């Protein structure tokens, strides 16, 4: 039996090994073991691995080891899809170079003031980490000179493609000097990413790491079919009976995050909203409060939650089901980190069962249904908490003055048990310890395509035209938007408004056709009513969309298809399919990232309970 390989065996310099040792790690993860020697030897690397595999250290350790601190210009560039990931990578790099005198790291992302970034660049940062949009802005402004760059890393390349940043990535790559080393990491390898590897990489060494199910996050998943009570009441019930440290609740819209937060605060939960309207400073303050325990719940949209990596989160509630299955996977990945177990709860409206089936199909496993906690469950939970509260108070030794008060009460010729019961009634506050029975509810009718012991003919899904993967057709509805060419609108404006306001992956937006006074757009069937109401108020170029339903799309051929390049192919001559730039300048970073932590080296170094790297 061969001995385990350690970081000391990989050829890393002493100052890097010392930093790694300080972090408490000895054994490299599979991707680190494979990539580090290649990058130290000057080879380009194409890494295919899921998040949580330790790829940040896989590229950062060998490349940082080769930085020359005496050269005060950018030598290493890391592009990440979100500002959260960029910050995490930069933080990790800071830890890795703690013993490298003179190595400076700067982070460039939208939402942060330019003067802060300019000051860091002028101080001679050798390592630049940022989002594609802000990096390209600095290049065009002449404030970022990459003429002497030695290393470039594309982290989460498929995410940058999915978010529409691939054009910016290629533009930046074209600016680099001829002799540089490239490392590209991606969980999947769609054709546009392959194209980049062929165009910009020199005989890359491919490293493929399979997910180790033994190290997969321990997440207990369940769903509740919305029935009998409103989601708000159900949410309060579930939160009351769930045993969680911290929780994140996902809503589909910014307005939803505010409404849910207001509901929770009124009912005694320490909560805060997290959405795209927040400044970066306020966002970071909110996440810091969640980390240090002064906040227990954040209510977030998918966009705002990207990049959250907080060990305390042990519960994820999908208040609104995501319209694409991949978003669900990334949502629940916020819990079950660092070897801890987690819970994920999904609310499913009657019209959303198809979306649930899509999620189960992607995950290759079913999600068990859970019953709404009834009055007996709530009552028992409240009583246990109340008894625990009283027991804890009895441990204090400063109760003597209250004993004298009891003596006064007992001499009032009142039964002691009645006095104690009256005290309990006063102490219970708003959360009553004795609850009336729930009103009877009609039994939920199981539909033909509902869950359980259904046996579905495989051809039935084909007849429904459901989407089986990227680029496959799915049932669509046609909508009209009261904004058109005369208003100066372009397809990218429509896509951006729908994708950002509804947190909808742009690939799930169908054929868009522009007319002079209005626009038609195809969206997946089963869109929640609340979301459509939100779209009606959404503004495009400062004009309300006033979205209205026209009917179901009758033929798949009438609908555009999409490829991984984000380009739409439709029959209408008025349809312009370029999707490469459907975003605002300063919000590029506020996108999607999910770093699942495992017991090897997760991408965000931790300071506790480490056994391996």
Curated annotation (Swiss-Prot):
Biological role: DEAD-box RNA helicase involved in various cellular processes at low temperature, including ribosome biogenesis, mRNA degradation and translation initiation.
Q: What is its main location?
A: cytoplasm
Q: Which GO terms fall under biological process for this protein?
A: cellular response to cold; response to cold; ribosomal large subunit assembly; RNA catabolic process
Ranges for the region named Disordered are 434-476, 552-613
Residue ranges annotated as compositionally biased, kind Basic and acidic residues, are 440-469, 556-613
**What EC number(s) has UniProt assigned to this enzyme?**
3.6.4.13
Family affiliation: Belongs to the DEAD box helicase family. DeaD/CsdA subfamily.
Q: What is this protein called?
A: ATP-dependent RNA helicase DeaD
Helicase ATP-binding domain: which residues? 36-207
Which source organism does the UniProt entry give? Haemophilus influenzae (strain ATCC 51907 / DSM 11121 / KW20 / Rd)
């Amino acid at each position: 039996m061969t001995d385990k390989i350690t970081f000391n065996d990989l050829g890393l310099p002493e100052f890097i090994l010392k930093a790694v040792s300080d972090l408490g790690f000895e054994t490299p993860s599979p991707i680190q073991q494979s990539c580090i020697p290649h990058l130290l030897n000057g080879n380009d690397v194409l890494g295919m691995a899921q998040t949580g595999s330790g790829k940040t250290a896989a590229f950062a350790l060998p490349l940082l080891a080769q930085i020359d601190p005496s050269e005060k210009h950018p030598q290493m560039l890391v592009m990440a899809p979100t500002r959260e990931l960029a910050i995490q990578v930069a933080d990790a790099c800071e830890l890795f170079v703690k013993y490298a005198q003179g190595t400076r790291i700067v982070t460039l992302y939208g939402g942060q003031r330019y003067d802060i970034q300019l000051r860091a660049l002028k101080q001679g940062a050798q390592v630049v980490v940022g989002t594609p949009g802000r990096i390209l802005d600095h290049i065009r402004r002449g404030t970022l000179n990459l003429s002497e760059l030695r290393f470039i890393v594309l982290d989460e390349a498929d995410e940058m493609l999915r978010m529409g940043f691939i054009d910016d990535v290629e533009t930046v790559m074209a600016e680099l000097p001829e002799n540089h080393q490239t490392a590209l990491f991606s969980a999947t390898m769609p054709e546009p990413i392959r194209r980049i590897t062929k165009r910009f990489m020199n005989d890359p060494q491919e490293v493929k790491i399979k997910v180790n199910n033994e190290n997969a996050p321990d997440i207990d998943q369940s769903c509740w079919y919305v029935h009998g009570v409103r989601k708000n009441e159900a949410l309060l019930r579930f939160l009351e009976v769930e045993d969680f440290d911290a929780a994140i609740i996902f809503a589909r819209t910014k307005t939803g995050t505010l409404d849910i937060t207001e509901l929770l605060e009124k009912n005694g939960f320490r909560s805060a909203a997290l959405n795209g309207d927040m400044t970066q400073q306020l966002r970071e303050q909110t996440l810091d409060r969640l980390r240090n325990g002064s906040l227990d719940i954040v209510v977030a949209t998918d966009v705002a939650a990207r990049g959250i990596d907080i060990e305390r989160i042990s519960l994820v509630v999908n208040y609104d089901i995501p319209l694409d299955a991949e978003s669900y996977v990334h949502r629940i990945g916020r819990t079950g980190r660092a070897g801890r177990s987690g819970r994920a709860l999904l609310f499913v409206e009657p019209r959303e069962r198809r979306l649930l089936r899509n999620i189960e199909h992607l995950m290759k496993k079913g999600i068990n249904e859970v019953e709404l906690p009834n009055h007996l469950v709530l009552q028992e939970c409240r009583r246990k908490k109340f008894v625990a509260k009283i027991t804890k108070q009895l441990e204090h030794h400063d109760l003597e003055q209250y004993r004298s008060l009891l003596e006064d009460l007992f001499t009032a010729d009142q039964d002691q048990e009645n006095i104690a019961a009256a005290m309990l009634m006063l102490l219970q506050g708003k959360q009553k310890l004795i609850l009336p029975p729930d009103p009877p509810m009609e039994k939920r009718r199981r539909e033909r395509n509902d869950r359980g012991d259904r046996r579905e003919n495989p051809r039935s899904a084909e007849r429904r035209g459901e989407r089986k993967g990227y680029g496959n057709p799915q049932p669509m509805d046609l909508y009209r938007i009261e904004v058109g060419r005369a208003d100066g609108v372009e397809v990218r404006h429509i896509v951006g408004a729908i994708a950002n306001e509804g947190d909808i992956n742009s690939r799930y937006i169908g054929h868009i056709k522009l007319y002079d006074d209005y626009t038609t757009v195809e969206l997946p069937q089963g869109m929640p009513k609340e979301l459509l109401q939100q779209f009606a108020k959404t503004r495009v170029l400062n004009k309300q969309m006033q979205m209205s339903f026209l009917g179901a799309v009758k033929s798949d051929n009438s609908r555009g298809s999409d490829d991984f390049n984000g380009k739409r192919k439709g029959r209408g001559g008025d349809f312009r399919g370029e999707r490469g730039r459907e975003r605002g300048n300063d919000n590029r970073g506020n996108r999607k990232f999910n770093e699942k932590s495992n017991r090897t080296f997760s991408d965000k170094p931790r300071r506790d309970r480490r056994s391996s790297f």
